[in-house]
Regions:
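Helix-loop-helix hairpins and the membrane-proximal interhelical loops
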Residues: 1-62, 144-148, 199-281
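Transmembrane alpha-helix interface/packing and boundary motifs in multi-pass membrane proteins
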Residues: 17-32, 77-89, 166-170, 256-266, ...
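Extracellular loop-to-transmembrane helix junctions
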Residues: 54-81
Length: 366
C-alpha cells in the first residue's frame, strides 16, 4: 500500500477508534474488551470495508494493523471517557458518602467536573511517562535481565499472595461474611475461566469472548445501577483546573508504575493493584490526586500491555490478546533501540487518541 494511502487509513481508523471509545466510555456497563471481542468476531466485515475504501490495503497484514490501531485508539479513548459516567452516574446518598469512590466524593462537594479533568490530566501524563519507561521495561522483562522468564516459576505463589491480600482487604471490622462472599466469587470466576479457556467448546475465541465479557463487565454494572438508590447531585462548580503541580507529576508517575506492573504480571488487574497499594499506604492520598493516579493507571496499562506483547510474546489484557490475533505474528522486540514498526504505529495511535480524548472529556464533564 502506498505511503499516503496508508497514512490516510491510519488516521481514519485512529479517529474511528476515538469515536468508538467515546461511545463505549459514555455508556455505563460497556468495556473495551467488548469492543475487542466484537472486532475479532466481525474481522471479515472489516476487511471488506477496508478493501472497498483502500483497495491497496486488502492484504491481511495491513488489515490487521489498521484494526489493531483502531482497537488501541478505542481503548485509550474509552479509558478517558469512562471517568465521565463513573463520576456522574450512581451518585451516592449522604449516608454512604464516606464509602464511595474519590470521584463521587468530589461530585458531592460540587467538583465532579474537576474530578474528570484531573483524571484526563492523569491519562495524558500516564501516556507520556509510559513512553519514557518503555525501553527500561523492555530491558527489564526481556534480555539482558529477562525478569519475565525468571518470574514465571513464581507465578502460582504470586497469585496466591494476591488472592489472599484481596480477601484480607475484605475483612475490615472482622466482617468474615464479606471474606466468604469474596472467596466464593473468586472460586466461581476461576471455574468460569477454566471452563471457557480450557474447556471443550467448539467455538472460536472471538465468539466465546464477546458474550463472556458482556456478562462479566456489562450486565452486572447495569443491574447494580438499576438496583442502587442514587442521591441528589448538588450544584456543580465550574472552575479552571490548577496548573500542573509536583503532586500531579508524582501521582502520575505512581500510576504509571502501577500500570507497568499490571501490564506484565499475570493475574494482576488495575483494581487489584490499587487495592494492594492502598494496603501499604500509611497515609492515603486525597481524592484529587487519586483521580490523577487512576487516569495514569488506565492509559499506561492500555499502552504498556500491548508493548509487553512485543517484549515477551505474552498478552496480559483483552486488548493485547485481540492485537496478537489481528497481527497474526507480532514480531519480538529483539533490539532495545530498534522498536518494531508495527509497535511504533500502535504507540502513535494510542498517544494521538489520548491527546484528542482528554480535552474532550474534560469539556463534556462541564
Amino acid at each position: 500500500m502506498a505511503l499516503p494511502g496508508f497514512v490516510l487509513g491510519f488516521l481514519l481508523f485512529t479517529l474511528l477508534g476515538v469515536a468508538s471509545g467515546i461511545a463505549t466510555g459514555l455508556s455505563p456497563g460497556l468495556h473495551i474488551n467488548n469492543v475487542a471481542a466484537l472486532v475479532l468476531a466481525t474481522r471479515s466485515t472489516w476487511a471488506s470495508f477496508i478493501a472497498s475504501v483502500f483497495p491497496d490495503a486488502a492484504d491481511s497484514e495491513t488489515v490487521g494493523l489498521l484494526l489493531a490501531c483502531y482497537l488501541l485508539a478505542a481503548a485509550a479513548s474509552h479509558a478517558v471517557f469512562d471517568f465521565v459516567p463513573s463520576v456522574f452516574l450512581g451518585a451516592p446518598t449522604e449516608d454512604t458518602a464516606l464509602a464511595t469512590l474519590p470521584g463521587h466524593r468530589l461530585l458531592l462537594v460540587g467538583q465532579g467536573a474537576k474530578a474528570v479533568a484531573l483524571a484526563a490530566r492523569g491519562a495524558v501524563l500516564g501516556t507520556a511517562f509510559a513512553l519514557v519507561v518503555l525501553i527500561p521495561l523492555r530491558l527489564l522483562l526481556a534480555d539482558p535481565v529477562d525478569l519475565a522468564a525468571r518470574f514465571r516459576s513464581w507465578s502460582p505463589l504470586f497469585l496466591i499472595f494476591v488472592i489472599s491480600a484481596l480477601l484480607a482487604s475484605e475483612a475490615r471490622g472482622r466482617r468474615w461474611r464479606r471474606v466468604a462472599r469474596a472467596a466464593w466469587v473468586q472460586a466461581v470466576a476461576g471455574l468460569l475461566g477454566i471452563a471457557v479457556l480450557r474447556g471443550l467448546s467448539p467455538l472460536d475465541s472471538g465468539t466465546v469472548l464477546f458474550p463472556l465479557f458482556s456478562g462479566l463487565f456489562g450486565i452486572p454494572s447495569l443491574l447494580f445501577g438499576l438496583a442502587s438508590r442514587a442521591g441528589d447531585i448538588p450544584a456543580q462548580r465550574i472552575e479552571p483546573l490548577r496548573r500542573l503541580s509536583r503532586d500531579d507529576v508524582a501521582s502520575a508517575i505512581r500510576g504509571t508504575l502501577a500500570g507497568a506492573s499490571v501490564s506484565w504480571l499475570p493475574g494482576l488487574s488495575g483494581g487489584a493493584a490499587a487495592t494492594l497499594a492502598s494496603l501499604r499506604l500509611r497515609k492515603p492520598i486525597g481524592p484529587t490526586q487519586f483521580m490523577v493516579v487512576l487516569g495514569a493507571v488506565s492509559t499506561s496499562t492500555s499502552l504498556l500491555s500491548v508493548a509487553v506483547l512485543f517484549m515477551i510474546q505474552r498478552a496480559r489484557s483483552g486488548a493485547a490478546v485481540a492485537v496478537a490475533d489481528l497481527l497474526i505474528d507480532p514480531g519480538r522486540w529483539s533490539n532495545p533501540i530498534a522498536t518494531p514498526a508495527s509497535l511504533l504505529l500502535l504507540l502513535v495511535a494510542t498517544g494521538l487518541a489520548t491527546a484528542i480524548a482528554a480535552p474532550l472529556a474534560a469539556r463534556i464533564a462541564r
